C-alpha cells in the first residue's frame, strides 16, 4: 500500500486515480503520524518550493519523511516533491529543503525556449533503474516546471532530459529514494509503469 502525503500542494486526485487504475491500494492523508504504517510513501507536488516546505514542516511531514527513510523504506517525489528532497532552492528567494539528496534547485534560463517547460519530453537513462524497468529508454513523459534539480552526487542521477539548452536531472534513484521531475500520473503507459515499479519495489 502507498501513502500519499497531502500537504496542500499536490496533484492528489490524479496520482490516487493512477494507482487505482493499476489496482494498487493507496491512501491520501494529511496526518504525518500515519506515515509509519506504510512501506511506500509518495510526495506529490504542484506549486512553489517555499510554501510547500513550510507546509511540510508545519504538518510534521519533514521529520516523518526522514524517519521513514532512516528505516530503509522507500519514498517517491513527483515534480515539486522531487525538488523538496534537495538541500535548497532559489525559487522566490532562498529556501532550505529536506536535504535528503544533497544539491540545489535552480531556475532555467533561456533566450530561445519558453519557460516553464510544459509538455512532453524524452528521458535518457543514466543507469539501470528500478523506476524505469520495462520502460524503453528515451520514452516521453509529461513535464510542467520552471526549476530543475542539480544534485551534488552524479551517482544519484537516474535519468536526464534536455531543455532550454541544458541537460538536467529528470530522475533520482538512491538507496530507496526515488524522484522524478515529470508527472508519471499524466504520462500514459510509461508513467503508469513507473508508478507500478515504485509500488512493487
UniProtKB/Swiss-Prot annotation:
Enzyme Commission numbers on file: 4.3.2.10, 3.5.1.2
Q: Name one Pfam family in it.
A: GATase
The main place the protein resides is cytoplasm
Q: Give the subcellular location.
A: Cytoplasm
Where does this protein act, in terms of pathway? Answer: Amino-acid biosynthesis; L-histidine biosynthesis; L-histidine from 5-phospho-alpha-D-ribose 1-diphosphate: step 5/9
What's a single GO CC term here?
cytoplasm
The record lists the catalysed reaction(s) as: 5-[(5-phospho-1-deoxy-D-ribulos-1-ylimino)methylamino]-1-(5-phospho-beta-D-ribosyl)imidazole-4-carboxamide + L-glutamine = D-erythro-1-(imidazol-4-yl)glycerol 3-phosphate + 5-amino-1-(5-phospho-beta-D-ribosyl)imidazole-4-carboxamide + L-glutamate + H(+); L-glutamine + H2O = L-glutamate + NH4(+)
Q: Which domain of life is it from?
A: Bacteria
Q: Which UniProt keywords apply?
A: Amino-acid biosynthesis, Cytoplasm, Glutamine amidotransferase, Histidine biosynthesis, Hydrolase, Lyase
Keyword Cell membrane among record annotations: no
**Function in brief:** IGPS catalyzes the conversion of PRFAR and glutamine to IGP, AICAR and glutamate. The HisH subunit catalyzes the hydrolysis of glutamine to glutamate and ammonia as part of the synthesis of IGP and AICAR. The resulting ammonia molecule is channeled to the active site of HisF.
What name does the UniProt record give this protein? Imidazole glycerol phosphate synthase subunit HisH
Amino acid at each position: 500500500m502507498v501513502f500519499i502525503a497531502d500537504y496542500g500542494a499536490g496533484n492528489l486526485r490524479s496520482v490516487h486515480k493512477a494507482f487505482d487504475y493499476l489496482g494498487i491500494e493507496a491512501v491520501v492523508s494529511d496526518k504525518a503520524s500515519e506515515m509509519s504504517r506504510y512501506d511506500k510513501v509518495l510526495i506529490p507536488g504542484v506549486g512553489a518550493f517555499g510554501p510547500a516546505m513550510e507546509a511540510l514542516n508545519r504538518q510534521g511531514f519533514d521529520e516523518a519523511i526522514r524517519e521513514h527513510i532512516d528505516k530503509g523504506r522507500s519514498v517517491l517525489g513527483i515534480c515539486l516533491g522531487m525538488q523538496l528532497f534537495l538541500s535548497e532552492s532559489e525559487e522566490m528567494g532562498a529556501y532550505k529543503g529536506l536535504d535528503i539528496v544533497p544539491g540545489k534547485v535552480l531556475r532555467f534560463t533561456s533566450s530561445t525556449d519558453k519557460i516553464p517547460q510544459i509538455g512532453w519530453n524524452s528521458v535518457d537513462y543514466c543507469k539501470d533503474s528500478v523506476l524505469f524497468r520495462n520502460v524503453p529508454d528515451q520514452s516521453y513523459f509529461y513535464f510542467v516546471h520552471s526549476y530543475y534539480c542539480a544534485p551534488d552526487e552524479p551517482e544519484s542521477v537516474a535519468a536526464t532530459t534536455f531543455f532550454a539548452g541544458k541537460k538536467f536531472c529528470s530522475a533520482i534513484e538512491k538507496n530507496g529514494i526515488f524522484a522524478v521531475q515529470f508527472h508519471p500520473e499524466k504520462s500514459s503507459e510509461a508513467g503508469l509503469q513507473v508508478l507500478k515499479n515504485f509500488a512493487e519495489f
